[in-house]
C-alpha cells in the first residue's frame, strides 16, 4: 500500500534539489514549486492521496530530468528520452 511517507522517501533525493517543497497543511500535503530567479512560489498542488502525490512528483521528476539532459539548449534526442524513461521506471519500481 502506498503511503505519503513512502512517496516522500522515494522522492527525497529529487526533493533535496530544492525546486520543490512538500508541506503539510490543514487540507493535506501540498507541493510547492520555487522559482529561484523570481524568488517566489510559482506552483502549488494539493495532494489528497499518496497516489496523487506520487503522480505529481513523477511528472515533475520526469520534466526535471528532461531539462537536465539538455539544459534547455536543444531538443531531446531518442537517447535522452530513453535515459529519462529508465530513471522514471526506477522511480515507479521504488513506489511499488
Label the model's feature ranges.
Residues 23-81, 85:
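Acidic, low-complexity, intrinsically disordered interaction modules
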Amino acid at each position: 500500500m502506498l503511503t505519503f511517507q513512502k512517496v516522500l522517501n522515494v522522492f527525497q533525493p529529487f526533493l533535496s534539489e530544492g525546486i520543490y517543497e512538500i508541506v503539510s497543511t490543514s487540507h493535506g500535503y501540498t507541493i510547492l514549486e520555487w522559482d529561484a530567479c523570481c524568488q517566489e512560489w510559482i506552483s502549488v498542488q494539493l495532494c489528497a492521496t499518496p497516489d496523487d502525490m506520487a503522480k505529481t512528483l513523477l511528472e515533475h521528476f520526469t520534466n526535471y530530468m528532461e531539462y537536465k539532459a539538455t539544459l534547455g539548449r536543444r531538443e531531446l534526442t531518442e537517447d535522452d528520452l530513453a535515459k529519462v524513461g529508465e530513471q522514471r521506471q526506477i522511480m515507479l519500481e521504488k513506489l511499488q
